């Protein structure tokens, strides 16, 4: 078993398996345009929790497939414009509570948090139809709609938009920031997944966002005869192929003792990013909320560099 130092050293240069599809950028530009159009029409319901610091509302907006999305919005009560954190939650967990999200108001931030729709959580769903048929493509579409909603809010400082998420939400934070380019100021992700689908499969990761791969290669393609076709479709929703397009600053936290989101795949997404970036790894932490990283996030949002740079 490798030492922590040896593991870190090997991960620092790992870039994952496979190549970015040639039409990846144009594919997501088209979908982003559709997401932006959806965000232009929404209905907000104000909640009775307003206080001296913040006002709360739930916004309903149709996604690119016409299905309704619910998005939580917290607006600081002090005069704007305000920076905003666009939040995405992990697989199997709901959006964070209003009380938790209100902490960002202390830093002067508003919050826009997508309540992700129910879906199968099988990343292979729809693969036979190519990237347009993937259920996870729609998940990313939904995330883009929520980001465009944030950009459209009159109190938001459009020059200080942050994407942030954990686990699946971490990958969505990277994906959205990559598609929006210069429109995102900061991007932070903890234990982001999925990324490096083929690498995760080859390494035997079969939990979380990768669980569908095990089922697929047991029930649908037991000899892996069509593996290349599957991974060609999944390349369009792979955070590892979004990250090279990032133009924001990037902060990533990785629990090295993670048996749900492959540390190697997380590093692959980070290592392919060419923007200003920092990664903090935690040898004895797994796929869980890491308090130390949340402290680093606080500093990242407070416009200072993360004070650790170990990878």
Q: Which positions does each model-derived feature cover?
A:
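C-terminal catalytic histidine-bearing segment of alpha/beta-hydrolase fold enzymes
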Residues: 267-311
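N-terminal targeting or regulatory segments adjacent to alpha/beta-hydrolase or S9 domains
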Residues: 1-54, 310-311
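Short beta-strand element of the alpha/beta-hydrolase
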Residues: 71, 75, 81-91
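Cap/lid segment of the alpha/beta-hydrolase catalytic domain
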Residues: 96-141, 199-200
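Acidic catalytic loop of the alpha/beta-hydrolase fold
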Residues: 256-261, 288
